[in-house]
Amino acid sequence: THKGWRCSAAQAYLKPARNRPNLRIETGTHVTGLLFEGRRVIGIHYVQDGVSRSARCRGEVLLAAGAIQTPQLLQLSGIGPADLLARFGIPVVHELHGVGENLQDHLQVRLYYECTKAITTNDQLNSLFGQAKIGLQWLLYRSGPLAVGINQGGCFMHALKDERGRPVAATPDIQFHVSTLSA
C-alpha cells in the first residue's frame, strides 16, 4: 500500500516511471525469446498484433516473466540444460543446468481460530455499521483494514529438523502468513 491506497506493481512503479526517456512501454505483446549479440543478451523478440518485432537495449536486460515463463523464455532462447534443448532442436547459447528445474508447488493449509470477543475484521464487516466505520476510517484517515494487504505478517522457518534439533536443509521449508480476515 502507498498512503493508504492498495495498488498494483504497475501503479506503484511503472506509472511514475512511464515518462522516462530510457523507457518504452509496449502493451498487447508476447515475448518469444531473447535477442543475443554473441552470448550477451541485448534485447528481446516479441509478437505484437501478429507481427514479429524486436527491442534492443543499450544497458542491462532484466528478465522478470514469473516463475514459469522466465525459465521457459531462457530455454526457448538457448539457455538451459543442453540435452533438453537438443531434444527440441534449440541451439545451445549457454548450457546452464537448473534452468526450468526445481519448480515446487506452493501448498497451503489454512487454520482458523475463533475469537472469544468480537474484535476481528470479519466481525467488523458483518454489520452495516461496521462496514461504514471501516469505510469512513479509510476515507478520512487512509488507515484501517482497507489500507493494508490481507496478510499482515509472515515468515519462513525450518520445520524439518534432525535428532539434535538442527534444520535438515540449508533453506527454510515452511512459510507462514498471518491474516486478519478469513473467507
Report residues per predicted region.
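Core beta-strand elements of the Rossmann-like FAD/NAD(P) dinucleotide-binding domain
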Residues: G50-I68
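Alpha-helical support elements that line or immediately flank enzyme active sites
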Residues: E60, A67-P81
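Conserved redox-cofactor binding core of oxidoreductases
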Residues: T1-V41, H45-V47, R110-G135
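General beta-strand structural signal in soluble alpha/beta enzymes
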Residues: E26-T27, L63, V92-E95
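Mid-to-C-terminal "cap/lid" subdomains and adjacent gly/pro-rich loops that border
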Residues: P71, P81-A183
